[in-house]
């Protein structure tokens, strides 16, 4: 983690469980902003690929983590991602903040 970054106002570190996957790909920051929670992450070198942009695998893991947070808070029970598809729109450069929001439209039984 880059200790020189300035965390945007209103965001707090998102607590992850030590030793679990999400603890290795952050840190994430969170802002509870009714009616929507917003996550951000600073893209530093450890999250980048050889092109100095966010690694696609990280972006997918980040999307899955944020989506899981929203899904769990909707159903209040353990959930899993059954399917996750992504079409990348544009790269996220090292040194940028990446914001994520999610919306649960439907839920299934699997």
Predicted features along the sequence, with ranges:
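Terminal targeting signals and extreme-terminal segments of soluble enzymes
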Residues: 1-110
